[in-house]
Amino acid sequence: MHGIEQPQLPLDYVHRCASTSFLLASLDGLLSEARELSGPLALITSSYYLLVSIALCWAIPGSFWYRPGCWLQPVSGRNLIFCGPTEALQRFRLYAARLGLVLSENCPRHGQSAAITLQSYWALPNNIWMDMAQLDLLTFSMPIANTFAYLADCEARFPPIVEGVGSAYYVPTLLGLTHQDPRLYLALRRRNLDLSGEPHRVRPGVLESMALLCSSVRSTSRSRQIPPLYGSVLHHVLGLAERDCILFDTDSNYSSYTHRVLEQDRNRADQSLFSIDLEYVHDLELIALGYSDEDDEDLDNFF
């Protein structure tokens, strides 16, 4: 695939696009929030919002939010390319520099588009087939992993990856989540997909994702699977989540959305969580990547 060739999407997904001006406004908000904090928490917040901002910018169904005109795509080796309108990428580089991350625009421009290679900031495994769904999970898991490494007073590192349901779903082993326990992952994905039509809910959606993971850490069933966490920063994150009406019951450590997902699963006990959600999202992603129904058999063999 060409370095800045934008994926072609079905019309119904194109209708969900926001504007380039909204992308720029999101970056403005990223800078503003980073400036309000200090110390290690500011560094974590800056890195987290920066990575999430990148992750939200490609136009592929199944990502946490839908953005027009900007997208990520893998290239050979350990590189990612962030592509989009020149104006948006220039603003992105400026804010990244203010947050301590230097990104050089080292890909040729084509008309009003530009591209930035992110090899200096992204360490991705070479031994897996990197489609957009995998990038979705990887970009989400890396900043979260570093956040929890800090909370646990450990050296920040990227989490290991295990294969989930099909090669398009690499679920991070962070917090002990594997393909055998997909509920929290699915709740995160459903929750953030629901926010795609509500741009003003971007920040609460990010906080909810963090709060769900924090809450999972505090549950007794997982307490032996991960390092112990130190309370002050964790409570700060959960406090932000409560302020934004994300957590409805801090004692049980569930988000309202997770509760609804679990209740829905109980109401349809005869149907598989995997067959309903994963196959549906998988099909949407394959369509967006240009595969047709006739390719299903070949794709199944490939995966």
UniProtKB/Swiss-Prot annotation:
Q: Which UniProt keywords apply?
A: Host-virus interaction, Inhibition of host innate immune response by virus, Suppressor of RNA silencing, Viral immunoevasion
One of the GO biological process terms = symbiont-mediated suppression of host innate immune response
Q: What's the family? A: Belongs to the polerovirus P0 protein family.
This chain's function reads: Suppressor of RNA-mediated gene silencing.
What protein name is recorded for this chain? Suppressor of silencing P0
Q: Which species does this protein come from? A: Pea enation mosaic virus-1 (strain WSG)
Organism ancestry: Viruses, Riboviria, Orthornavirae, Pisuviricota, Pisoniviricetes
